[in-house]
Design a protein with these regions (language model features):
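Surface-exposed coil/turn segments at beta-strand junctions on protein surfaces, enriched
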Residues: 1-2, 10, 33-35, 46-48, ...
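Short beta-strands within extracellular/lumenal beta-sheet-rich domains
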Residues: 38-40, 117-129, 165-166
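Solvent-exposed beta-strand/loop surfaces of large extracellular or lumenal domains
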Residues: 17-39, 150-166
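Edge strands and adjacent loops of beta-rich recognition modules
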Residues: 87-126
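Mature extracytoplasmic enzyme cores
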Residues: 122-128, 233-237, 241
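Glycine/proline-rich low-complexity spacer/linker segments in large multi-domain proteins
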Residues: 58-85, 186-238
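Aromatic-lined ligand-binding clefts that engage carbohydrates, nucleic acids, or primary amines
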Residues: 1-19, 53, 127-153, 180-184
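Short, surface-exposed tryptophan/glycine-enriched loops
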Residues: 36-52, 58, 167-177, 188, ...
Length: 241
């Protein structure tokens, strides 16, 4: 059971919340994404198998707008007949072109147990530099995300957000071994949706969220998620005049 397992409820102060019949509450100033999204730890009351989170409002008023609940923690998701099953976490790797594809043409985090993940995933490589002369460029040959952060030897070196998908890191490179870290950032599309009705990538209107499966959650494999990630090793290029 992940020790950081939590459920996020919008405006938790308006409800009585239980997990498996045990009362749980959001701690003050413990929120996620938005200050109205209270993070509620449930590791102490969760169990293997089915878990039920219940929210009650009495009386129910115009301020009680029901919104999705989000489950957070160190775990992965396995597609099931209805939605997903939480399974032990594992490290993400380079996407494989042989798997199901998305805009990048390769498999991303969504097919590695993280279909709703939107934050950053870091990839590291070490490069030996015999002679630090000329310019050094970090290049991403195949990736998909909103932006990629670049760090060299533990120091922030810049961002990659537009073609030709390169970042000049000359001033951070030293003679000998250099560690380069690329952090690919996704977007909130996979987290917030829309997840149903095969929405077009790049479009999200109020009506997009009005479409839902009937009855109940569809198979996990049918959820709409973008394949973010790194699909080929990044490279450190040296340009000498």
């Amino acid at each position: 059971m992940p020790q950081n397992l939590a459920v996020v409820i919008e405006r938790p102060d308006l409800y009585t919340i239980t997990c498996n019949g045990q009362t749980v509450k959001a701690k003050r100033n413990d929120w996620w994404l938005d200050k109205a999204f209270g993070r509620i730890g449930i590791a102490s009351v969760a169990r293997a198998g089915e878990n039920v989170v219940t929210i009650k409002a009495a009386p129910f008023t115009m301020f009680h707008e029901l919104e999705p609940a989000y489950v957070l923690g160190d775990f992965t998701l396995k597609p099931a007949e209805k939605g997903f099953v939480i399974t032990p976490g594992h490290a993400l790797t380079l996407g494989a072109a042989s798997q199901a594809t998305s805009p990048s043409g390769c498999a991303g985090w969504n097919l590695q147990g993280h279909p709703f993940y939107s934050a950053g995933v870091s990839y590291r490589e070490r490069f030996d530099v015999a002679k630090p002369a000329g310019r050094f460029i970090v290049a991403l040959p195949n990736w998909y995300g909103s932006v990629a952060k670049v760090a060299v030897n533990g120091k922030p070196a810049g961002f990659i957000d537009a073609p030709p998908w390169e970042c000049d890191v000359t001033q951070y490179v030293k003679r000998g071994q250099n560690e380069v870290e690329i952090t690919v950032i996704g977007t909130l599309k996979n987290t917030l949706g829309p997840h149903h009705g095969k929405p077009a990538l790049g479009a999200a209107w109020p009506a997009s969220f009005h479409q839902g499966p009937n009855p109940g959650p569809p198979p996990g494999d049918s959820y709409s998620a973008v394949a973010y990630g790194l699909f080929e090793p990044f490279v450190l290029k040296q340009a000498v005049k």
